[in-house]
């Protein structure tokens, strides 16, 4: 599913990733943990083709993306990878349903099909009755679930999440954490989650520990 080999990355004189080798299989829920500055977010961004490594090879869902041009990468990213961040980044002028549909529009999915897909996912997440509400009418937990639904709309093979529950209270954290496993079981996606949350790391299928740009 995800294969990284010899990944290095530097910013100026600071080497952030120091030869990362990593294999993640289809359907795994994997957490990446480590102290601040360990390189977790940089690794996730490279895994998601949002940034490029200085050296190394990246294979995602059977495709070597290492040599792709930006236009190819953008199309690949929109189809194969979903992203969830700490802050939901929903567009305030659109409803929950419309926010979820945006990546489908970018991918050229017809409006009717995009709407049906979005409503199916929102229904699965218990948000069907909130579909017509705008972000300022939703709770923090609801907004983050809408963001997860948006990440799923194009049926990507992998979901990459960076501190997805970092801004939530304990109850909403637990609900979101369980949601990742429910989604994996329902849709079969692979989840890679950068987190400082020990409770989440403990329940993932595998935990990857990073220190100073290395996996230990």
UniProtKB/Swiss-Prot annotation:
Q: Name one GO cellular component term.
A: plasma membrane
Q: Which InterPro entries match?
A: AAA+_ATPase (IPR003593), ABC_transporter-like_ATP-bd (IPR003439), ABC_transporter-like_CS (IPR017871), MacB-like_ATP-bd (IPR017911), P-loop_NTPase (IPR027417)
Alphabetical list of Pfam families matching this protein: ABC_tran
EC class, as a word, reads translocase
- Its membrane topology, per UniProt? Peripheral membrane protein
- SMART domains to which the protein is assigned, alphabetical: AAA (SM00382)
Taxonomy, superkingdom: Bacteria
Q: How does it assemble?
A: The complex is composed of two ATP-binding proteins (LolD) and two transmembrane proteins (LolC and LolE).
Family label? Belongs to the ABC transporter superfamily. Lipoprotein translocase (TC 3.A.1.125) family.
What is the designated name of this protein? Lipoprotein-releasing system ATP-binding protein LolD
Q: Which organism is it from?
A: Bacteroides fragilis (strain YCH46)
List the taxonomic lineage: Bacteria, Pseudomonadati, Bacteroidota, Bacteroidia, Bacteroidales
